[in-house]
Every structure is written in C-alpha cells, then in structure tokens.
From Swiss-Prot:
Feature: compositional bias, Basic and acidic residues: 137-147
Xref: CDD domains: SmpB (cd09294)
Major location (coarse): cytoplasm
Keyword field: Cytoplasm, RNA-binding
Family matches, as SUPFAM superfamilies: Small protein B (SmpB)
InterPro entries from the UniProt entry: SmpB, SsrA-bd_prot, SsrA-bd_prot_CS
Protein name: SsrA-binding protein
Domain of life: Bacteria
GO biological process, alphabetically ordered: trans-translation
GO CC terms of this entry: cytosol
Molecular function GO terms recorded: RNA binding
Gene that specifies this protein: smpB
Species per Swiss-Prot/TrEMBL record: Nocardioides sp. (strain ATCC BAA-499 / JS614)
Protein role: Required for rescue of stalled ribosomes mediated by trans-translation. Binds to transfer-messenger RNA (tmRNA), required for stable association of tmRNA with ribosomes. tmRNA and SmpB together mimic tRNA shape, replacing the anticodon stem-loop with SmpB. tmRNA is encoded by the ssrA gene; the 2 termini fold to resemble tRNA(Ala) and it encodes a 'tag peptide', a short internal open reading frame. During trans-translation Ala-aminoacylated tmRNA acts like a tRNA, entering the A-site of stalled ribosomes, displacing the stalled mRNA.
Region annotated Disordered, chain positions: 137-159
C-alpha cells in the first residue's frame, strides 16, 4: 500500500484565529493509538477546545476531541485524552520560555496528514479583547464592501 503524498486537512480551528492574535506557528507530530488514526482517516476531529500544555519538558495536547472509531471494539481510545506532541527540544524550550515570559498561550490551528503521518499545527497566540474582535470584524466588512464596489465598477466598464 503506497503512502499518500502531500497534505490532507482533517480539522481546522477557525475559532482560534478569531479569538487570538497568532504570533508564531509550529508543526508537531502526534503520538496516537491505532483507533485514533483510523478515526482521523475518516475525517473526524474537533480542535475547538484544544490547548497545549508544557509539562516537565514535554508538550501535551489537551481538549482535542477525536471520536471513537466506529468499527472499534474494546481497544477504542478515550475521545478527549491528552496526547503527546513530538517537537524538537529547542522548540519546546522556546515555546515554554515565551509562554512564561510574555503570557502567551499555545493553541492548535489545524490537524492534517502529511506524507501519511498525523501532524498538528500549533501557534503561540495572545488572546484578543472583545473590542479587538469587533474591530477585526468591522475591518473585514469594510474590505469586503470595497472589493464589491470595485468589482461592480469594473463590471460596469466592461458592459
């Protein structure tokens, strides 16, 4: 059986991009059980409540929901168990230092398969205040209206 090449997206955490200012991103491998991999291959996962914790020099992914494998038996995994992240030592140290110094948090952004291996994209992020969210929403709305006006103007020129 040949390995699939490229990147196959399983889940995205759109809420994280809305609730946080993303500063740095990292790609980490995941330590998974067999039924978790099979469930992910079915495209089933949720990153919404996920966060990363660094404990005794190891990075752990908490709150990510990978539902039980539908054809699994007694070997099925717990849906919300903590999962170990595979990062280089210097990456873990850098993340831990920045989280402790600047009050940042680490959130998962995307879960995907890359060359047959499950990966998670994590980000160092700073929480947005509610007025930040409203300002970002207003800016997106203004940009959308500008683009639509330009599009209508250009379309009128071609007719």
């Amino acid at each position: 059986m040949a390995k699939e090449q490229g990147r196959k997206l399983i889940a995205q955490n759109k809420k994280a991009r809305h609730d946080y200012h993303i500063e740095d991103t990292y790609e980490a491998g995941l330590v998974l059980q067999g039924t978790e991999v099979k469930s992910l291959r079915q495209g089933r996962a949720s990153l919404v409540d996920g966060f990363v914790d660094i404990d005794r020099g190891e990075a752990w992914l908490h709150g990510v929901h990978i539902p039980e494998y539908s054809q699994g038996t007694w070997t099925n995994h717990a849906a919300r168990r903590k999962r170990k992240l595979l990062l280089n030592r210097d990456e873990i140290d850098k993340i831990e230092r920045r989280v402790n110094e600047k009050g940042l948090t680490v959130v998962p952004l995307a879960l995907y398969f890359k060359d047959g291996r499950a990966k998670v994209e994590i980000a160092l992020a700073k929480g947005k205040k509610s007025w930040d969210k409203r300002a970002a929403l207003a800016e997106r709305q203004a940009n959308r209206e500008t683009e639509q006006a330009v599009g209508r103007r250009l379309k009128g020129m071609h007719d």
